[in-house]
Amino acid sequence: MPNYFFIQSQDPYTDRVTDDQFLLMSQLAGEGKEVSLFLTQNGVVPAAFQAESPMFDKLLDQKIKIYADKFSLEQREIAETELKRNIESAEIHVVVQAMLAGDKVIWN
């Protein structure tokens, strides 16, 4: 069974495609597939505690590993302590590791 590794660089407030991506992640996780999500660039915006994004927030209750790019957080002045639950700050090497492990990598 393949693992899925999504890279989200867009925020759900300016790019409606992100909700479709979040729905796909939710469906795959619901089917028992291993799903990870790496938020980068503007994709880190819904990870902030005060941000409202219903489709993104649903992912927090599923078995999905969610990472937020440290550099992108710093650029947007989002402290690691301001992240929503179940989100881990990480560096780009997690993407490289997923690729080397043979995960199906999907970038938006």
Please tell me what each predicted stretch does.
Residues 52-79:
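A glycine-rich helix N-cap at a beta->alpha junction
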Residues 17-32:
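Histidine-anchored nucleotide/phosphate-binding helix
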Residues 4-19, 41-48:
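Short, glycine-rich nucleotide/cofactor-binding loops
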Residues 40-44, 70-73:
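Short beta-alpha junction loops
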Residues 19-23, 50-55:
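Charged helix-capping and loop-helix junction motifs
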Residues 76-108:
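C-terminal structural segments of small proteins and small subunits
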Residues 29, 60, 99-100:
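Anion (oxyanion) recognition and catalysis
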Residues 3, 30-36, 65:
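Residues at the starts of beta-strands that form the adenosine-phosphate
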